Amino acid sequence: MRRLDAIIFDFDGTLADVPLDFDFMKTKIAALGEVFMDERPVPDGTPALEWLDRLSAQVMERDRDEGMEFLSRGRLVIAAMELDAARDGCLYEFTRPVLDDLKARGVAPGVISRNISAAIKKVFPDIEDHLQVFIPRESADRLKPDPAHLLQALERIGVKPGRALMVGDHPMDVETGKRAGAMAAGVTTGRIGAEGFAHLEPDFVASDVAALMSELKRSGLI
């Protein structure tokens, strides 16, 4: 097996503990939606960003200006919650050493995130000093699980998907890696246990990023 040229990480729950309550986020979006829609929308399994896009598109079918206002306010709600959570967030102790070790080994570390850079940098102000590519929400052409998010990062550093590993604490991250043609690893530092990744058949599942790096070293991948 050839050595990896790049490892791209998710941020929240993977490199940092950020207590963001996505269920409460969707409750807030639902309350806002009640102002613009005939009845209060009921949250489903759709992630908050995509759910807001879908709801606002429904409003736009009736009144474009109202739909745009709903979308704008909803995005502000999401960003405010991300920033609030970041104030209580903390970087995992292994994060900086792992990223710096990868660079020293000639493996390009990167981060792609559905979160905004302002929130990420509240937790990790010097993040770009430790990475070779960083694509937060506002810089992404399309967001994971769309593989374009990962492919955008890999293209920026000139690495082919087959020589890269995507790492995250959510099945969405493993799905992103698989769809992009990269290797994929799940870590259980978030809300998902090992069994939550099984249906996607990730290449690796580890208790945290530090444990994953040890496994990659034993496998000769880094």
Model-derived features: where do they sit?
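Short, flexible loop segments at the rims of nucleotide/cofactor-binding pockets, characterized by
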Residues: 85-90, 112, 142, 183-184
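Asp-based, Mg2+/Mn2+-dependent phosphohydrolase catalytic module
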Residues: 1-5, 97-104, 117-222
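N-terminal helical cap/lid subdomain that shapes the substrate entry/recognition surface
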Residues: 1-96, 100-105, 121
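Conserved phosphate-coupling serine/threonine residues in phosphotransfer and NTP-handling enzymes
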Residues: 14, 113-115
